[in-house]
Amino acid sequence: MQVLDNTAHPDRQKKETSAGALYDLIAPKKEMVKPVGQYNKVRIISKSGHIEHWLNCFKLLEYDFGSSEIKSIISKSKFRDMPLFAKNNFGRIGFQGDHGEVWYRNIRIREL
């Protein structure tokens, strides 16, 4: 799930790279990000390959890992030449910020 300042960062101009998106693949249904300086409440639910992105109590998007739809989207993306992209349904969780300071708090990971 993309974490981004939708008011200032150049990636905001493309919906698929705006806050809440499945980065560069699926755009959020609506912009629900709070202004800079306020914390957003994020929930990512992953159960049996079904993924949901929630931002500030609004479901932004959902998809099924391994579905023909997601495979088609990936096949047309910059990730198509990465053979392991979206192949594992277990592993480590990473937080990445390559566009300035990013702050997180109250991170909880629960098994469903």
What residue ranges belong to the model's regions?
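Carbohydrate-interacting regions of secretory-pathway proteins
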Residues: M1-L112
